[in-house]
Amino acid sequence: MSFLPFDQQKPLDFIAVGRLCIDLNANEIHRPMEETMTFTKYVGGSPANIAIGMARLGMKTGFIGRVADDQMGRFIVRYLKNNGIDTSHVITDKSGSVTGLAFTEIKSPTDCSILMYRDNVADLKLEPNDIDEDYIRRAKCLLISGTALAKSPSREAVFLALDYARRHGTVVVFDLDYRPYTWQSKEETAIYYNLAAEKCDVIIGTREEFDMMERFDGQRRDDEQTARKWFDYNAKIVVIKHGKDGSIAYTKTGETFVGTIFPANIVKTFGAGDSYAAGFIYGLMNDWPIPKAMEYGAAAASIVISSHSCSDAMPTLAQIEQFIEQHRNGSAARK
């Protein structure tokens, strides 16, 4: 059953809009940041990772965003190009902005944290004039993420992209991607997240992210109640993630699916959500049953958290299928 109206006549499969930054992952693991001396540089940012994941899976992928006019910005653009991502709408910001940096601390496979440098970052300089209506018209799917809503003018640019997508029948996926350090308050966050989510076809986030969005709703909802709220707007599918306990997908037609949980040799917890999103969206775009899309998303997540990198570790289709074949014990099930 097809849940989403992907227009197969459109020439571009997938566009992501938003954050492009640098991850600096600790090489000396099992120690605090204060004692870590060396880091390895990777392209980062949830929309960037998801776009890279989609490109690795063979999708014609583009990106809309801004990078700083510095060595890190040029590194990001070159990396995207080398991964087959169209960068014609990645703009070099000339205002003196900088590239966002994320230093990761890996004390243990389950005790990881991030030290962020996000002052005056280029990705939040994205302007409405940077959003090309025809570019979005030509895409089957647009991905937005919550961090891009945190400040103007990026916030307005994302809402314009949403309007163009709805005007031209481009399916919109909202990766909630809540990063509290980017926002002024939880109240501000909830307001803009809700305004964006009302316009989206697929919403993917953790239980904690949905709780943040519902802070004005009076009482805590369970997963099914949360999903039903968004079905009253434009959502067709809502996915609520529960970390190591897996994910649950709800459809507007009333179905519920519990996702596969795969074992992993966990190195760090970062990147699981991004790789899950890429695998899941890929499945939806190929009109797979939702349980199969969830299975591929879960497998991709297990692969990435077993690796030092996020972007470099985004798997190909063959790698996901090989991983699933090796772990055939789990399955996604209709609830």
UniProtKB/Swiss-Prot annotation:
Domain of life: Bacteria
E.C. designation(s): 2.7.1.92
CDD domains: KdgK
Recorded catalytic activity of this chain's protein: 5-dehydro-2-deoxy-D-gluconate + ATP = 6-phospho-5-dehydro-2-deoxy-D-gluconate + ADP + H(+)
InterPro entries linked: Carboh/pur_kinase_PfkB_CS, DKG_kinase_firmi, Myo_inos_IolC, Myo_inos_IolC-like_sf, PfkB_Carbo_kinase, PfkB_dom, Ribokinase-like
GO molecular function, one term: 5-dehydro-2-deoxygluconokinase activity
GO biological process: inositol catabolic process
Gene3D superfamilies: 3.40.1190.20, putative 5-dehydro-2- deoxygluconokinase (2.20.150.10)
The entry's keywords: ATP-binding, Kinase, Nucleotide-binding, Transferase
Associated pathway: Polyol metabolism; myo-inositol degradation into acetyl-CoA; acetyl-CoA from myo-inositol: step 5/7
Residue ranges crossing the lipid bilayer per the database entry: none
PANTHER family referenced in this protein's UniProt entry, alphabetically: 5-DEHYDRO-2-DEOXYGLUCONOKINASE, HEXOKINASE FAMILY MEMBER
Family membership: Belongs to the carbohydrate kinase PfkB family.
NCBIfam families for the chain: myo_inos_iolC_N (TIGR04382)
Its job: Catalyzes the phosphorylation of 5-dehydro-2-deoxy-D-gluconate (2-deoxy-5-keto-D-gluconate or DKG) to 6-phospho-5-dehydro-2-deoxy-D-gluconate (DKGP).
Protein name per Swiss-Prot or TrEMBL: 5-dehydro-2-deoxygluconokinase
Source organism (scientific name): Geobacillus kaustophilus (strain HTA426)
Classification lineage: Bacteria, Bacillati, Bacillota, Bacilli, Bacillales
